Curated annotation (Swiss-Prot):
<dbReference type="GO" id="GO:0008927">
    <property type="term" value="F:mannonate dehydratase activity"/>
</dbReference>
<comment type="similarity">
    <text>Belongs to the mannonate dehydratase family.</text>
</comment>
<protein>
    <recommendedName>
        <fullName>Mannonate dehydratase</fullName>
        <ecNumber>4.2.1.8</ecNumber>
    </recommendedName>
</protein>
<dbReference type="InterPro" id="IPR004628">
    <property type="entry name" value="Man_deHydtase"/>
</dbReference>
<comment type="pathway">
    <text>Carbohydrate metabolism; pentose and glucuronate interconversion.</text>
</comment>
<keyword id="KW-0464">Manganese</keyword>
<keyword id="KW-0408">Iron</keyword>
<dbReference type="GO" id="GO:0030145">
    <property type="term" value="F:manganese ion binding"/>
</dbReference>
<dbReference type="InterPro" id="IPR036237">
    <property type="entry name" value="Xyl_isomerase-like_sf"/>
</dbReference>
<keyword id="KW-0456">Lyase</keyword>
<comment type="function">
    <text>Catalyzes the dehydration of D-mannonate.</text>
</comment>
<dbReference type="Pfam" id="PF03786">
    <property type="entry name" value="UxuA"/>
</dbReference>
<dbReference type="GO" id="GO:0008198">
    <property type="term" value="F:ferrous iron binding"/>
</dbReference>
<dbReference type="GO" id="GO:0042840">
    <property type="term" value="P:D-glucuronate catabolic process"/>
</dbReference>
Amino acid sequence: MEQTWRWYGPNDPVSLNDIRQAGATGIVNGLHDIPNGQVWGKKAILARKEIIEGSSLTWSVVESVPVHEEIKTRTGNYATWIENYKQTLINLAECGIDTVCYNFMPVLDWTRTDLEFEMEDGSRALRFDQIAFAAFELHILKRPNAENDYSADEQLQAKVYFDNMSEAQIAKLTANIIAGLPGAEEGYTLEEFQAQLDRYKDIDKETLRNNLAFFLKELMPICESYGLKLAIHPDDPPRPILGLPRVVSTIDDINWLTTQVPEKMNGITMCTGSYGVRGDNDLVNMIKQHGDRIYFTHLRSTQREKNQKSFHEAAHLGGDVDMYNVVMELLREEQRREKSGNIRLIPMRPDHGHQMLDDLKKKTNPGYSAIGRLKGLAEVRGLEVGLKRAFFNK
């Protein structure tokens, strides 16, 4: 696998030199300063590429080109936004970048309730607490009909949770959920946030699916012409939240999407942490069935808690993800590609990492501190080397 690292640009506290020292050779990056929907010009793309290559690294994957909300809802100026997206893809391809990760999650890119969850060893991780999230929906946001999404027991626990929160805790939980995270442009007040949710009140899973398929069918001629691979990121968490539909959460979703849009440039990002939150997602089988569609992979693990909808980010080789067999199957897919003449390695990045050691004293992007990802990359690299020597170099 190609060892890559997500970098948030010149303002990222983790420098390109740090990334080189971690052993990564590829950079995963996006032009986050350009508003959603606007065209990424060649001048801006080449300027960023020059910075990356100036540190003897390669811009391997774009993560991500955000999809405008009006494309997802297929309302307003969606046709204009699609044309802009096409031009951005053309510009990226003509600048030598051939893989783009994106997502089709309504409103929020990814959601956690705690960005500083303390682990037993004193490091910090990201966490999603189902009861805290219920307290937010039911008693802070007060989303209409939110009670329909929670059991009576969860509603009771959420009320107790909320009643014991201070004003500061309410503000922090709210900020964690709706204030926006690294790589995302949007941040909302409660009122603005509810207004965004309301845009989807008449959009169910089938409608959102069809909007995604429509969008991809518009892009495929360009992708096929330029050899540019799209790799959709799964929903995080992989189930409906906030009354919003989700369309990339299970193998059934992948089956549907690849049937509706069969072109090979329509691919997936295998994010083991996102898919792995669901106990009914067999990650190894997903790779076996759709390995030829995997153009990018995020390797991390999560640990489901007593409430199976709650989880926290585990160590890369721990938690619920069978990382041994996941990496084994990815290496088998690379071997299949090599035999067919495709020598391009699958770009892999150690997704997220615990905040630990000296990084505990620093301001870092949630999930994207240097040392935790350095540890994760080293562990996955060691696993890959061991598997290759034992099974693939004979």
